Amino acid sequence: SGGNRYFPNSGVSSLGHAIPAAIGARFADTASTWAIIGDGGFQMCCMELMTAVNYDIPLNVVLFNNATMGLIRKNQTQQYERRFIDCDFVNPDYAALAQSFGIGYRRVADARDLEALFAQDDLTGAINLIEIPLDKDAFPNYLSKR
């Protein structure tokens, strides 16, 4: 069936899956393609942006930046009394990284930035890195309630 699709990677591990999967999806369908990824997973596959550049594959990457391995931190919060081991890290300057790849970069710090992003910017036909900073201790609630 037509329409929009969202293909999450769940069960095995999500780290590093979104960008290569979005590139593959773009080969199958020329519709606007978005990859949604956390900063931990992004650091495992950011070089795949160069694949998109080399093959001129339009792609929008939404990067949630909380400077931590979010699911690991959530687990250590809930099950280990906030004793954090090896989940936090230092991120690169994502604007400089995007510039080094020759791709677009936008930072969305609040709702106004998000509205402006979609109202003013043409996000089609190019490769864009869209960084959204998040609080490292704000965890999503999943349907499984875990």
Regions found by a protein language model. Name each.
Residues S1-R146:
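Thiamine diphosphate
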